[in-house]
Amino acid sequence: MSEIKVGENESLENALRRFKKKCARAGVLSEVRKREHYEKPSVKKKKKSEAARKRKFK
């Protein structure tokens, strides 16, 4: 879990902006979207190979 320490003179908006940036860098939101619904292992494997194919032909 991402944590930030809020300074004494720091506004809530600045602290929230730093927290959101830290979460984005840690990949929290993408992980949540990925785990939102169960995905069968065969589907995961298929998506992974499709992504590799797209990267290869790009």
Curated annotation (Swiss-Prot):
Molecular function in Gene Ontology: structural constituent of ribosome
GO annotation, cellular component aspect: ribonucleoprotein complex; ribosome
Domain of life per record: Bacteria
PROSITE patterns to which the protein is assigned, alphabetical: RIBOSOMAL_S21 (PS01181)
Region called Disordered, residue ranges: 32-58
This protein's UniProt keywords: Ribonucleoprotein, Ribosomal protein
Basic residues composition bias: residue spans: 43-58
Family, per entry: Belongs to the bacterial ribosomal protein bS21 family.
Protein name listed in UniProt: Small ribosomal subunit protein bS21
Organism: Clostridium botulinum (strain Hall / ATCC 3502 / NCTC 13319 / Type A)
UniProt gene name: rpsU
